[in-house]
Swiss-Prot record:
GO terms for cellular component: cytoplasm. One of its GO terms (biological process) is protein refolding. One of its GO terms (molecular function) is protein folding chaperone. Disulfide bonds join C231-C233, C264-C267. It is found in: Cytoplasm. Keywords: Chaperone, Cytoplasm, Disulfide bond, Redox-active center, Zinc. PANTHER family: 33 KDA CHAPERONIN. This is 33 kDa chaperonin. Its main location: cytoplasm. It comes from Yersinia pseudotuberculosis serotype O:3 (strain YPIII). The gene is hslO. Belongs to the HSP33 family. InterPro entries: Heat_shock_Hsp33, Heat_shock_Hsp33_C, Heat_shock_Hsp33_N, Hsp33_helix_hairpin_bin_dom_sf.
C-alpha cells in the first residue's frame, strides 16, 4: 500500500460484486498513542478501526459511523471507533480488569454487544445493535449486514507490525444491491480474498494486492481516499460543557485543584480552565486558547 493510509474501492467487471481495500497503519498508531492498552485490546482496536473505515466507505452521504463494543461483566467495558465519510478516524478503549495477551473477543467483553450508529449530517440517526455471535469483529459485522441490508458481505481484517510499529488493514467484498446474485461467484471471490497475507496488505500497492488475488479477473480500481486520525475535541467544546454545570460544582472543582483539567480520552489533549477562565465563560465570552498536548 501507499506510505500513507488510504482506502481503495474496486469493482469486478464480470461479477455483481464490489470491493474495498484499506491500510490504516499510521492512523492505528495514533489511536494507540498515549495509551497503555494490553496487546489483545490493541489488536481489537485495530480490527475495529479497519472495519469502521470499510463501513464508512459505504456511506452515500455526509455523516459518520460509530462502531462501539459495550462490555458486560467483563474486563473491557468499552471500545469505540468513530469515522466519517472523509475517512477521519478516532478511537478509545476502557479497561478495568486483567486481559491476557491471547484473550478472545468473548473473554474481553463477556455478555456485551456491538452497536453500529450511523449519523447523517442531515436526516435521522440510525442505530443497530448486534449480538456478539461471531468469534471476531469481522464475523459480527457480516451478520449485521445480512440482518440490516440483506447483502452478502465478507470482511477480511489483518493486524500486526511492520518495522516494530503497529499495522492494520483489511478488505471488504459485498454483493451489489438490486443485482442478480450468484452465490458461487461470490464465494469464489471470497475464497480468493481470504488468502491475503497481512504483510501484503500492510506493504504492497493496492494494484499489486488486487493482481495477486484476482489476476484472472477484470478489476477496476478507483482513485484512493486518504484515511487519517482526527479528534474533534476542542477548548470551545470543553467550555460549552463547563457552562452547563451548576456553579457550586464548578466552584468545588476549582477549590480542589486550583483549576479544572479536562482530558480528551481519544487524543490525550488537556484543556485547563482557571478561575478567570470560568468567570469569563459565565459572563458569556468565548474560551481562551490554552491547551496542553
Amino acid at each position: 500500500m501507499s506510505n500513507h493510509d488510504q482506502l481503495h474501492r474496486y469493482l469486478f467487471a464480470n461479477h455483481a460484486v464490489r470491493g474495498e481495500l484499506v491500510s490504516v497503519n499510521e492512523t492505528y498508531q495514533q489511536v494507540l498513542a498515549n495509551h497503555d492498552y494490553p496487546p489483545a485490546v490493541q489488536k481489537l482496536l485495530g480490527e475495529m478501526l479497519v472495519a469502521t473505515s470499510l463501513l464508512t466507505a459505504t456511506l452515500k452521504f455526509d455523516g459518520d459511523i460509530t462502531v462501539q463494543l459495550q462490555g458486560g461483566d467483563s474486563p473491557l467495558t468499552l471500545a469505540v471507533i468513530n469515522g466519517n465519510n472523509r475517512q477521519e478516524m478516532r478511537g478509545v478503549a476502557r479497561v478495568k480488569g486483567e486481559i491476557s495477551d491471547d484473550s478472545t473477543l468473548q473473554e474481553m467483553v463477556g455478555n456485551g454487544y456491538l452497536v453500529i450508529t450511523i449519523t447523517p449530517a442531515q436526516g435521522e440517526r440510525y442505530q443497530g445493535v448486534v449480538a456478539l455471535e461471531g468469534e471476531t469483529i469481522a464475523a459480527c459485522l457480516e451478520n449485521y449486514f445480512m440482518q440490516s441490508e440483506q447483502l452478502p458481505t465478507r470482511l477480511f481484517i489483518r493486524t500486526g507490525h511492520v518495522a516494530d510499529k503497529a499495522a492494520a488493514g483489511g478488505m471488504l467484498l459485498q454483493v451489489l444491491p438490486a443485482q442478480e446474485r450468484n452465490e458461487d461467484e461470490f464465494d469464489h471471490l471470497a475464497q480468493l480474498t481470504a488468502t491475503i497475507k497481512a504483510e501484503e496488505l500492510f506493504t504492497l500497492p493496492a494494484n499489486e494486492v488486487l493482481y495477486r488475488l484476482y489476476h484472472q479477473e477484470e478489476v477496476t480500481l478507483y482513485e484512493p481516499q486518504n484515511v487519517s486520525f482526527r479528534c474533534t475535541c476542542s477548548r470551545q467544546r470543553c467550555a460549552d460543557a463547563l457552562v452547563t454545570l451548576a456553579d457550586d460544582d464548578v466552584t468545588e472543582m476549582l477549590e480542589q485543584d486550583g483549576n479544572i483539567d479536562m482530558h480528551c480520552e481519544y487524543c490525550g489533549n488537556h484543556y485547563l480552565f482557571d478561575a478567570v477562565d470560568i468567570a469569563t465563560l459565565k459572563n458569556g465570552n468565548s474560551a481562551s486558547s490554552e491547551q496542553i498536548h
